[in-house]
């Protein structure tokens, strides 16, 4: 695993403004090696064609939800070990439990607060 600040991170969200906020938040934390995808399908293409150390994805996306993307990531042998942090407006406990059972490493409820986001990332890699 590369040093934390050198990690290549894929940010997946259907809203460009949200991707920008997440990428800027990661940059504030010293994570500058980011790429982005606007849906689950393009995220899978990127994940299969490049090496990523970490994925931040949105729960609610058209075409392929964050949950479906998580399941796809966990189903591919060379991707299943990549840590995934899900960002969601939906804090429903049953959804969170289902995502954790599917292999989610951590989640953050929107709006994303920098210190909480940092703590979640640190916990994944401790």
Task: Please annotate each region the language model reported.
Residues 5, 51-53, 78-83:
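His-Asp phosphorelay/catalytic-motif detector in bacterial-type signaling
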Residues 6-17, 22-26, 55:
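Conserved acidic segment of CheY-like receiver
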Residues 36-54:
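Acidic, metal-coordinating helix/loop segments flanking the phosphotransfer/catalytic sites
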Residues 39-42, 65-71:
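Acidic catalytic/metal-coordinating carboxylates
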Residues 61:
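Receiver (REC) domain active-site loop signature in two-component systems and cognate sites
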Residues 68, 91-106:
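Alpha4 helix (beta4-alpha4-beta5 surface) of REC/receiver domains from two-component response regulators
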Residues 112-121:
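C-terminal output helix
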